Structure formats: structure tokens, C-alpha cells
Amino acid sequence: MRRILGLLLLASLAFTAYAGDKTTDIFKEDGTVRVECKASYKRNGMSTADLANILTGISTIKGTQYYSQSKKEVTTLFTDAYTVEEPDYAKKTADKHLEAPLPQKIDIFGMLEDSRFGENVYQFSYVFDENHIILKITNIAPMRYSFLKAIDTNCFTCLLDIALTEDEIVVNNKGFCKPAVLPSFMESRINNAITNRMDALFGWFEKGITE
């Protein structure tokens, strides 16, 4: 019964976050875990600047949930999230707020703390056009699982590609991660952790445009 309730809650969360046409594919090729997610949503009058400020609101990643296969329940994935001033000096600062006209490019650093890999600083790189936004999220230091290095620097990447048409927001997201060499008994666990985090980052943005 507990598992059924967890699945029902997950379905409810997914409907809230992905209230549009959506397909997700997860596969592994040449040791690289890949996630691809395509979706479309009603634009509802949102501007490029509106979407940009959803993406720069790094603190809103805090509390993002997922369904844990090991715990058989919906649980919090990112327990903390905030913008930092410098990658090597993780001092918390306010989220970046942008006004039109948007800059062509900006880089922001964010600290994300999660239940599996602990605290890690990521680089959020943005490219803005009139009706198009690309966000690349990359780890800038090794990510560890307990005492083991699970992911090398610059080996975890989420790419959010967002285009605005007259009536829709079209999302084409891709995630890539090549884990470090790990004991065979840990590979499946780490691969699942990677795909969960990619899907959660995609869902964070998509939830922001549907709430």
C-alpha cells in the first residue's frame, strides 16, 4: 500500500510539473548516461525575460522531489540550493534578477546540496536570444558518493533548450554524464542517481512555467 501511495503521489507531481506533451528517453552509450526530454506548453503570455528569471532562480531548486526506488517513496532530492558569488568561495548571495533587454550571455554559480552527492557547486551558463534560451548546467568539481569519486569535473551536464513560438514554449532538454570508474555493484545505483538528478533539474524549470 505504501508503494502504491508513493506512485500515486509521484504521478500527481509529474502531472503538475509536466502539464503538456512530454516524452523522456533514458539510455547508456559508451559508458555515458544520457537523458533526453521533449515537451511543449502553452505560453500564456510569458516573455523571454519571465522564463529567464525562472532559470536564474537557483534557490527555487531547493525542495525538488523525486520518487526513490530504494525507499519506495517520494522524497526530497535537493535539500538546499542557492546562488554563490564565486565558485571557489561559496558565499550565499541573492538570485540574479534580469530585466529586458536581456544580456546575450551570463554565467552564474550555484550551490546544490542533494541527498546522494552532498554539496556541489555548478556553473549555470545562459545564452539569450529574442525567443530562445539555452542553459547549460555543469559540475565544476568532482562529485563524491560517500568516500568514492563518482563523477569527475565537467562530466555532469544538463542542457535546457527553450524556444518560444507565438503560442507555445517548446522545451528540448538533454543530459549527459560519464561516471568515474566504480565498483560494479555501485554502477546501477550511481546511474539511477544521475538520471534522477537530470530529470529533477528538467522538472524544476518545467514546474516553474506551469505553476
Whereabouts are the PLM-identified features?
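Surface-exposed amphipathic alpha-helical segments
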Residues: 190-211
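Hydrophobic/aromatic beta-strand elements that line small-molecule binding cavities or substrate pockets
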Residues: 121-128, 157-164
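Sec-dependent signal peptide recognition
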Residues: 2-7
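A mature extracytoplasmic/lumenal domain signature
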Residues: 128, 137-141, 173-177
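Hydrophobic h-region of N-terminal signal peptides that target proteins for export
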Residues: 10-19
